[in-house]
Amino acid sequence: IDAGLTFPTDEMPGIDTVIPDITYLKENREKVKAVFLTHGHEDHIGAVPYLLRQIDAPVYGSKLTLGLLSNKLTERRVEGDLREIRDGQTVRTKYFSAEFIHVCHSVAGSMAIALRTPVGTIFHTGDFKIDYTPIGGESMNLNRFAEIGNEGVLLLLAESTNVERQGYTMSEVVVTSTLRKLFVENADRRIIIATFASNVDR
């Protein structure tokens, strides 16, 4: 699940990117049946081109996630068997199945993944934000989260930026109304806004 990269610290002169150690995967490449992507941020898909040079496996992700990945593969001249999935879709292999569930995040097409194995369910949330009024209009499927929880989960792998902070993250709707207000108040001035390129809604 996911294969991201990060950027070097000041203590790493001459290094452009930092990718995971995939030695185990290379040594066990016949066991790798698929690559599942939760969303299209660099820290989750950035190392996929390096992985696919070593591992021959289909890559599953949402339409936008695969679109972002496709550009990276083209840049690095790497071929990939990319397979689009949708919310609620299940991918089955001989040994396990993977159900994809929509979650809200700062990039569209984000998914959680419920892996059903012979020993139990492993639930990977991916990055998420509980937003009851998302810009795209599609709320996180918390009902499905509850159903899977009631079925029984062997292991929960949960991630969320700023999870250690108290309180709630504001809805994207609040950001939109704030931006509109700033545009109205500064109609005669130049406005420069920095944001992540992958945050299509903003």
Predicted regions and their residues:
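His/Asp/Glu-rich metal-coordinating catalytic cores
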Residues: I1-F36, H41-R202
